[in-house]
């Protein structure tokens, strides 16, 4: 049962308290560790078993792509069907709706204190970057790049030093399924905007060479290249060096470039590239390859690019290291100053959805790099077994400390791979999976401390039918005594759903009858 029963959809009290917004980065901090410190959460390995479902909100789209921002009494979340929402933290009622972003919200919600108060920032998949007043829900500014004709804003921006850095991909990855579309001409990139005014400060494309006609099909349809190299995910920032670190995707068309499937270091002030390190050569692939469309390159690559933001963490030897996870199932450790590879670890067969898909997490104090493995059975190294599950690596040398694999031997239902981003806190890491499972794993040995099946119907707090399904993309968030997750992700043949679920630590039961019976857990 929900601790808060069905409420009216709109709140009577709409005032948002805005002094403690969290988090302000997709990766929790500028280094993208996805580790929530003790001062920001009371959830730990000792009490995570007390998590209970507080309320469920019915999203108006069946493929939620947002990651929440939480304050003292408000949850800001992007419902692509309704736009950015300000929800009451206690009941889930709606304080305001930002209708300008309806149908578009695609990122985590970020915030920054300005002269007029708290400003929220996020991207719409096709509309660009929004700056919104957190008190009123009114648009302050909206900006798009002009350098590319069909940009796609699929990654979360990063706020630093009065600027907002926006990753850019391209709609051509999907347009390529149209055999009469001349694929492809566009490049991914990263753009910097003034966070106060929305003025574009610089733009760095991932491909500097302009596209040219490289052939034809159907006699008259021109084939173009090079193209692609999208930036799917949030940048990582190191304020000491002033460098942004970006992961790059595949080329959409021939010829392949040295910038695809690569890691970039970029000067945050100038937008100049500092170094680039490519890991997979010749990876040219687009959605047309899935249906034998003539826009597919003549010799398509494996589509084993990078989707997870880089992580900066200490390796326990007083050295800052850049850790990146690839869809191929590899983890690479690099020197952030030069791009030199320190070590790499091949964990799994990989595939179109990973391998490592959306994100890693790092607990520097424990010396652990958490690596979720999807190994969705499509693409990848077919000669290797699939090993979906959670891996814990030693930050120093990449050795496996422990692993907890999903049992797929008698699979009855959807693939339970760990594709979404994960989040860690003291003594634990929390991960969702493509079958709708949500679990907290012990940092010590990987044992499951708490679990919950989100792939079902929920009693809703608003007027929208509410069903959980695949968990993907941004994954769960831990803040204060809450755990939040969007369940249902209808992209790439996954199970669609529309539930925003909010869990809360229940009060510890007082033993009044001297019984030794264990407390009932909130798992199913």
Region spans (language model):
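Beta-propeller domains
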Residues: 46-48, 79-92
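Short loop/turn segments that connect beta-strands within beta-propeller blades
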Residues: 88-91, 133-136, 194-197, 268-270, ...
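Beta-propeller blade signature
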Residues: 186-198, 259-271, 387-396, 498-507
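Blade/loop signatures of beta-propeller domains
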Residues: 10-53
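Repeat-blade elements of multi-bladed beta-propeller folds
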Residues: 20-30, 61-83, 102-129, 149-182, ...
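Surface-exposed loop and turn segments in beta-propeller and other repeat-based domains
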Residues: 144-147, 203-225, 274-301, 346-351, ...
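A structural motif specific to WD40 beta-propellers
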Residues: 54, 93-96, 140-142, 201-202, ...
């Amino acid at each position: 049962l929900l601790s808060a029963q069905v409420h009216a959809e709109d709140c009577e009290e709409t005032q948002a308290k805005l002094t403690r917004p969290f988090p302000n980065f997709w990766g929790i901090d500028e280094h993208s560790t996805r580790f929530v410190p003790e001062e920001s959460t009371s959830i730990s390995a000792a009490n995570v078993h007390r998590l209970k479902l507080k309320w469920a909100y019915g999203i108006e789209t069946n493929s939620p792509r947002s990651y929440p921002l939480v304050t003292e009494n408000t949850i800001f979340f992007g419902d692509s069907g309704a736009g950015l929402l300000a929800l009451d933290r206690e009941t889930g009622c709606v304080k305001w709706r930002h209708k300008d972003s309806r149908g578009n919200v695609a990122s985590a919600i970020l915030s920054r204190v300005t002269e007029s108060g708290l400003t929220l920032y996020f991207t719409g998949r096709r509309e660009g970057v929004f700056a919104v007043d957190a008190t009123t829900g009114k648009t302050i500014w909206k900006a798009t790049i002009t350098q590319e004709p069909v940009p796609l804003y699929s990654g979360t921006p990063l706020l630093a030093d009065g600027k907002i850095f926006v990753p850019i991909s391209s709609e051509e990855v999907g347009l390529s399924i149209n055999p009469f579309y001349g694929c492809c001409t566009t490049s991914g990139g990263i753009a910097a905007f003034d966070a106060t005014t929305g003025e574009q400060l610089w733009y760095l494309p991932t491909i500097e060479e302009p596209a040219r006609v490289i052939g034809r099909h159907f006699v008259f349809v021109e084939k173009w290249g090079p193209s692609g190299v999208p930036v799917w995910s949030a940048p990582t920032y190191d304020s000491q060096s002033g460098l942004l670190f970006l992961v790059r995707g595949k080329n959409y068309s021939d010829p392949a470039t040295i910038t695809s499937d690569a890691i970039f270091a970029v000067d945050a002030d100038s937008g100049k590239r500092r170094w680039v390190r490519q890991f997979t050569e010749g990876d040219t692939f687009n959605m047309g390859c899935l249906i034998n469309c003539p826009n597919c390159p003549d010799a398509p690559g494996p589509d084993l690019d990078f989707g997870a933001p880089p992580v900066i963490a200490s390796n326990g030897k007083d050295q800052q290291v850049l850790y990146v996870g690839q869809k191929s199932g590899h983890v690479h450790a690099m020197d952030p100053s030069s791009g030199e590879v320190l070590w790499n670890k091949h964990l799994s067969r990989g595939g179109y959805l990973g391998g490592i898909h959306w994100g890693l997490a790092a607990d520097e104090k424990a010396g652990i790099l958490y690596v979720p493995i999807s190994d969705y059975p499509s693409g990848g190294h077919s000669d290797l077994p699939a090993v979906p599950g959670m891996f814990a690596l030693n930050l120093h040398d990449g050795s496996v400390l422990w692993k907890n694999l999903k049992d797929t031997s008698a699979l009855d239902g959807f693939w339970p791979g760990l594709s979404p981003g994960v989040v860690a806190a003291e003594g634990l890491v929390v991960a969702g999976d493509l079958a709708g499972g949500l679990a907290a794993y012990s940092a010590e040995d990987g044992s499951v401390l708490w679990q919950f099946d989100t792939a079902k119907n929920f009693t809703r707090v608003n007027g929208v039918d509410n069903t959980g399904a695949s968990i993907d993309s941004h994954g769960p968030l831990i803040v204060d005594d809450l755990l939040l997750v969007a369940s249902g992700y209808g992209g790439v043949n996954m199970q669609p759903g529309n539930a925003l679920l909010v869990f809360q630590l229940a009060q510890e039961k007082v033993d009044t009858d001297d019984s030794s019976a264990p407390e009932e857990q909130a798992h199913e």
